[in-house]
Amino acid sequence: MAKKGKKLQDAAKLIDRNSLYSAQEAIELAQKTSTVNFDATVEVAFRLGIDTRKNDQQIRGAVVLPNGTGKTQRVLVFAKGEKLKEAEAAGADYVGDAEYIQKIQQGWFDFDVIVATPDMMGEVGKLGRVLGPKGLMPNPKTGTVTFDVTKAIEEIKAGKVEYRADKAGIIHAPIGKVSFSAAKLVENFLAVFDVVQKAKPAAAKGTYMKSVNITTTMGPAVKIDAANVVVK
């Protein structure tokens, strides 16, 4: 553990904690200071000036990253009739109804995302206590409760990520892997930055984006100069 700690300390020395970096600089530094021996995930964290206790200041949604996440998402679809066949044709990993509800109740979680048609939500809703804490409950805001299962599956497979402000007003979202080129990570970052910026609640007061950091798995945080981020 001491060796890992020294690696992180050495990596952190490359970053000036008092400086704000451009997106390009921050991402390149995050890549350079990744100390783990696997292809780490690169993540962005937004600290927002919102009061999440108020319903009109909740932020939740999804965005398709232009260059994907670098991770293959396993999709479970709850549907009936023709929608079952449509989901299979679109590339869903698991498709069904009651049998998968039972499997989940018994502790099965070999999937990453659930898509459900609206007519299945009465049944899927029974899994709320199990799926909710894991962030797996389908939601219309993230496009995972829909009759257009083909579009939902294609977007997820293409690299759609969900984002949600936690109680402290912080949003975490993956933007790819350390092995990605910096240019691809910047494009993915800008896609997330754009939707979070546009999601500012009308009722939010004061500074909206209080801080924006780039990190890698177990790596140090690099601060981004959010005021000068330009989304083309």
Swiss-Prot record:
One of its GO terms (biological process) is translation. One of its GO terms (cellular component) is large ribosomal subunit. Signal peptide: none annotated. Keywords: Repressor, Ribonucleoprotein, Ribosomal protein, RNA-binding, rRNA-binding, Translation regulation, tRNA-binding. It comes from the Bacteria. It holds the Pfam family Ribosomal_L1. One of its GO terms (molecular function) is rRNA binding. Part of the 50S ribosomal subunit. Binds directly to 23S rRNA. The L1 stalk is quite mobile in the ribosome, and is involved in E site tRNA release. Protein L1 is also a translational repressor protein, it controls the translation of the L11 operon by binding to its mRNA. Belongs to the universal ribosomal protein uL1 family. NCBIfam families: rplA_bact. This is Large ribosomal subunit protein uL1. It comes from Lysinibacillus sphaericus (strain C3-41).
